[in-house]
């Protein structure tokens, strides 16, 4: 990597050459600057980063270790069985606990919807069998509706002719 900074030409890490007008052409070795660690620091439940030490360039935003649950979150925590009553729920809860409870609630809601869908399928089957016993079908309904429309059109044509 070549970078021209003022009258210096930097050739990669630690190798600098003076390249200004009238400057002697010499290469000097400088120690490479310490680079900040790559990636985001991992936070433990205590709130301190695992690779704590002098931070490099810029600030690192801390992730809150606990948050106050909303009423909806409290209901989800109760519904998923994490707590037995509203009084047992602490004022501050780790976000992982809320996420886990929400995921369990999503799964329970999906199971409920699957069950309701199966019940609705059986209800449609039963109602269709009853309609067959009464000799009802969509074809007979459509034929009756079209016959009614023809009668109304014929009556309208007779009234118009008079």
Swiss-Prot record:
Q: Which UniProt keywords apply?
A: Membrane, Transmembrane, Transmembrane helix
**Residues covered by region (Disordered):** 26-69
Please indicate which superkingdom the organism of origin belongs to. Answer: Eukaryota
Tagged with keyword Metal-binding: no
Keyword Membrane found: yes
What GO cellular component entries does it have?
membrane
Q: Where in the cell is it found?
A: Membrane
Cite the InterPro entries for this sequence: DUF1075
In the bilayer, the protein is annotated as: Single-pass membrane protein
* TM stretches of this protein: 107-127
User: What's the family?
Assistant: Belongs to the UPF0389 family.
What name appears for this protein in its UniProt entry? Protein FAM162B
Natural source organism: Homo sapiens
Q: What is the lineage of its organism?
A: Eukaryota, Metazoa, Chordata, Craniata, Vertebrata
Its encoding gene is what?
FAM162B
């Amino acid at each position: 990597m070549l970078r021209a900074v003022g009258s210096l030409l930097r050739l990669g890490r630690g190798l600098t050459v003076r390249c200004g007008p009238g400057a002697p052409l010499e290469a000097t070795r400088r120690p490479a600057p310490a680079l900040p660690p790559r990636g985001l620091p991992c936070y433990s439940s205590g709130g301190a980063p695992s690779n704590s030490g002098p931070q490099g360039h810029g600030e690192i935003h801390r992730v809150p270790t606990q948050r106050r649950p909303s009423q909806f979150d409290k209901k989800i925590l109760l519904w998923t069985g994490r707590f037995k009553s509203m009084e047992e729920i602490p004022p501050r809860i780790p976000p992982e606990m809320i996420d886990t409870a929400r995921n369990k609630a999503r799964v329970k809601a999906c199971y409920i919807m699957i069950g309701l869908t199966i019940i609705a399928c059986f209800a449609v089957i039963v109602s269709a069998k009853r309609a067959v016993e009464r000799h009802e079908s969509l074809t007979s309904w459509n034929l009756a509706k079209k016959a009614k429309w023809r009668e109304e059109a014929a009556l309208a044509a007779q009234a118009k002719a008079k």
